[in-house]
Amino acid sequence: MSRNDDEQARGSRWERETQDLSTQVEYLQEELALARRKLTETPGHVRLLEERLAATKAQVERMSEQNERLVATLKDAREQIVTLKEEIDRLAQPPSGYGVFIEAREDGTVDVFTGGRKMRVALSPSIEPESLRRGQEVLLNDALNVVESLGFERAGDVVTLKELIESDTGHPDRALVTSHADEERVVHLADSLTNAPLRAGDSLLVEPRSGYAYERIQKSEVEELVLEEVPDVDYESIGGLDGQIELIRDAVELPFLHADLFAEYELRPPKGVLLYGPPGCGKTLIAKAVANSLAKKVAEARGDDFTGGDRAKSYFLNIKGPELLNKYVGETERHIRLVFQRAREKASEGQPVIVFFDEMDSVFRTRGSGVSSDVENTIVPQLLSEIDGVEGLENVIVIGASNREDMIDPAILRPGRLDVKIKIERPDAESARDIFSKYVTTKLPLNEADLAEQGGSREACVQEMIQQAVERMYTETEENRFLEVTYADGDKEVLYFKDFNSGAMIQNIVDRAKKMAIKEFLNSQRKGLRLQHLLDACVDEFRENEDLPNTTNPDDWARISGKKGERIVYIRTLVSGKGDESGRSIDTVSNTGQYL
């Protein structure tokens, strides 16, 4: 019984073990199936993970770019905030004032002029006191301390220097100046003017509030009226005036070049020369040539090298006569004094000085001839005293030019003032040839046909052109008749174009001919100056002058044109095509009042 029980027990245990093994086998089979299924699904899962990884990387890159943009935006915003803060701080700062530096003190303070007050203020440590210059502008903070040095003032009033005032050290540090209202004032000289060559009559820039003069205006009051240079004109460029040139060279150059001989013979050099004659005949040209020639001769006498880059030095003060006149009483006289003061300064340097008054009759008229202002009553005596004052000086001569010498005050023309009087006549035929030769030269392009007529000789061609042009101008033919004048006694006289020729007219004729040659070349490609151009230019020049005599009082016109003698009362033009026009007579006007 017990044996059977044991067997049953073993059988039951085997069944249980068998069931357990079966269960384990099923579990292992399921696990194996699951493993097989997972092994089959693994590649797809890996691909899914790779896709997720790639998407994650792309998202990370996008976030990085976005972060970089945000960082840049934050930086820009920070910079803008800083800039705005600086702008706000700058706008919130109190205003800075300007002052004028006067003097530095030993204790480190400085004296400045600001707001109409003279103050002693502190100096910023960043500024060296030695770097500040008197009259210099400085910047002041809200505590009125100097924080920055600036330049010199460049705007203000223009005044005239009258006299320099020296300090205790012997150097000028102040100046006596006058304004246009003749108000005198003493001003300080800024350091910018300490070493500047200042002289009476100079124009200075003054800041009226601080009382400092900062700058010398280059165009001073006298320089507005004179041309201080050596003209580039020589005697060779003047034609037809050999006799007059010889006279003025004797009057001007000999005293300068041979002063010892003049002293030995006790001969006083002439003080002045008057050049008079009709307009356009070379008065101003001769005066310029005198200055140029005198500069060269003086340089040669002193052994200077005139051929180098430096020009020979002399001074030609070309006074613009009408501009001397000023509406303020005494201003014209003061200008004359300044002109001669400038001449004395230049002469003291040992250089020849020529004071040239062009259109002298416009300023120095006969005293008592004026009707309304009578300014000549004071201007003429001022010039007389200045010319007499030149007597004690060397190297100064006065040259006057006028086409109405009859209107100049006789006291100016007497010996001892304008000693030498040279009349510049209208050119005759021989003089006209000489003048033409200055403008019609072999260097000009000449027409081939005209050259062929002279055998290809340029010299012969030019001479033929000049000869034909002079004959056209000076022949007393019907076509050259210009005017018929009637004198007060009833006599009549026919005047030809040759009676009114001048060097300026000849130059104008040549210029017309050259312009005709240029226009012909542009239109027909025929190059070169032709004789016909000169002849046509003569006709055009004459035609332009047809109406000129009738534009003014005949008697005054005759005086200006150089026709002196009995008074002319009637003028009639005789130019072809003008026969229907009547002349112009003189009407006697009575009770003219004070204005005529």
UniProtKB/Swiss-Prot annotation:
Keywords of the record: ATP-binding, Chaperone, Coiled coil, Nucleotide-binding, Proteasome
Keyword Nucleotide-binding (UniProt): yes
Annotated S-S bridges: none
Cellular compartments per GO CC: proteasome complex
Coiled-coil segments: 12-94
Region annotation Docks into pockets in the proteasome alpha-ring: where it falls in the sequence: 595-596
Gene Ontology molecular functions: ATP binding; ATP hydrolysis activity
Gene3D superfamilies registered for this protein in UniProt: 1.10.8.60, 1.20.5.170, Nucleic acid-binding proteins, P-loop containing nucleotide triphosphate hydrolases
Single Gene Ontology BP annotation: modification-dependent protein catabolic process
Pathway entry: Protein degradation; proteasomal Pup-dependent pathway
Keyword hit for Transferase: no
NCBIfam families: pup_AAA (TIGR03689)
Family: Belongs to the AAA ATPase family.
Domain topic, free-text comment: Consists of three main regions, an N-terminal coiled-coil domain that binds to protein Pup and functions as a docking station, an interdomain involved in ARC hexamerization, and a C-terminal ATPase domain of the AAA type.
Free-text function comment from the UniProt entry: ATPase which is responsible for recognizing, binding, unfolding and translocation of pupylated proteins into the bacterial 20S proteasome core particle. May be essential for opening the gate of the 20S proteasome via an interaction with its C-terminus, thereby allowing substrate entry and access to the site of proteolysis. Thus, the C-termini of the proteasomal ATPase may function like a 'key in a lock' to induce gate opening and therefore regulate proteolysis.
Subunit description: Homohexamer. Assembles into a hexameric ring structure that caps the 20S proteasome core. Strongly interacts with the prokaryotic ubiquitin-like protein Pup through a hydrophobic interface; the interacting region of ARC lies in its N-terminal coiled-coil domain. There is one Pup binding site per ARC hexamer ring. Upon ATP-binding, the C-terminus of ARC interacts with the alpha-rings of the proteasome core, possibly by binding to the intersubunit pockets.
Record PANTHER family: AAA-FAMILY ATPASE, PROTEASOME-ASSOCIATED ATPASE
Protein name: Proteasome-associated ATPase
Gene: arc
